[in-house]
Amino acid sequence: MSEPARLISPEKRGEDLDITLRPQSLDEFTGQAEARANLKVFIEAAKNRGEALDHVLFVGPPGLGKTTLAQIMAKELGVNFRSTSGPVIAKAGDLAALLTNLEERDVLFIDEIHRLNPAVEEILYPAMEDYQLDLIIGEGPAARSVKIDLSKFTLVAATTRLGLLTTPLRDRFGIPVRLTFYTVEELELIVRRGARLMNLPMTEEGAREIARRARGTPRIAGRLLRRVRDFAEVARAEAVTREIADEALTRLLVDNVGFDQLDKRYLNMIAVNFGGGPVGIETIAAGLSEPRDAIEDIIEPYMIQQGFIQRTPRGRVLTAIAWKHLGMQPPKEMEAAQFRLFQEDD
């Protein structure tokens, strides 16, 4: 994105890698109750049988804990954990180097697997299914096929764009897990746990204020907590109260629902320039000077989940909640137009 320092971006940053704040077991992990319960069963069953866990695919917006869950799974299985990402595996040799170094039942985590090179993906199929690598050595008439046996491993992959995965790859994951945005109550527990680990006194109201503005995303909650701590320490506050959190986040231009300036530009552009919509994603991307992928992956998911925008066959449309948040009145014809659009959407 053109604004990499955006405070509420769910994309990973160096400061987010603080392992002291990360849960170390499924019992410590807050939220995603159904996914955690199922993973516990699958892990226990694999351990009892002495087998590698089936391959796991995590699907969901960034910042919800896919990497953390993969690390916890390896820890609870009692095996090694290796991590990489789709764009990093440029050629078949890169993947072969990773796979041949795995020991029995190890966990290999591939983030952003939807960005995997298609040529590399072809090599991954037999590795996942038969625990074998089929490599072509040499070129031309001298080329020959070589089969390499692999240790039985577990591939844990993560994607924000399930639709970009090919069907053959998607079908090779025995355990698909969809992660959803967290509730304010779950995020409040995460914030309070983080504050305890930081030895930062905090009231329940202070924790809730941070949680309300964290866009349903633990990674953002942790980042906001660190910045609020800075304000509290400089102000020599005895504890982080609701007032301290509100002042800090307001000064950081994060509003009461977790929107920043880019979110407001998005909503304002649709409201002012296009009468509330419908407007196509390419037009929005051009108007904001942001890549389409960034808008679809980073900006829109939380807005859609919270009911601020509606995706229709003809484009994005602001809802009544969005107009109220902007402090604007929708055009008089908007209600009837939206009704027709939603009928088409059905």
Swiss-Prot record:
One of its GO terms (biological process) is DNA repair. Belongs to the RuvB family. This is Holliday junction branch migration complex subunit RuvB. Keywords: ATP-binding, Cytoplasm, DNA damage, DNA recombination, DNA repair, DNA-binding, Hydrolase, Nucleotide-binding. It catalyses: ATP + H2O = ADP + phosphate + H(+). Residues 1-182 are annotated as: Large ATPase domain (RuvB-L). Homohexamer. Forms an RuvA(8)-RuvB(12)-Holliday junction (HJ) complex. HJ DNA is sandwiched between 2 RuvA tetramers; dsDNA enters through RuvA and exits via RuvB. An RuvB hexamer assembles on each DNA strand where it exits the tetramer. Each RuvB hexamer is contacted by two RuvA subunits (via domain III) on 2 adjacent RuvB subunits; this complex drives branch migration. In the full resolvosome a probable DNA-RuvA(4)-RuvB(12)-RuvC(2) complex forms which resolves the HJ. Mg(2+) binds at T67. It holds the Pfam family RuvB_C. DNA binds at R292, R311, R316. It comes from Rhizobium etli (strain ATCC 51251 / DSM 11541 / JCM 21823 / NBRC 15573 / CFN 42). Residues 183-253 are annotated as: Small ATPAse domain (RuvB-S). The RuvA-RuvB-RuvC complex processes Holliday junction (HJ) DNA during genetic recombination and DNA repair, while the RuvA-RuvB complex plays an important role in the rescue of blocked DNA replication forks via replication fork reversal (RFR). RuvA specifically binds to HJ cruciform DNA, conferring on it an open structure. The RuvB hexamer acts as an ATP-dependent pump, pulling dsDNA into and through the RuvAB complex. RuvB forms 2 homohexamers on either side of HJ DNA bound by 1 or 2 RuvA tetramers; 4 subunits per hexamer contact DNA at a time.
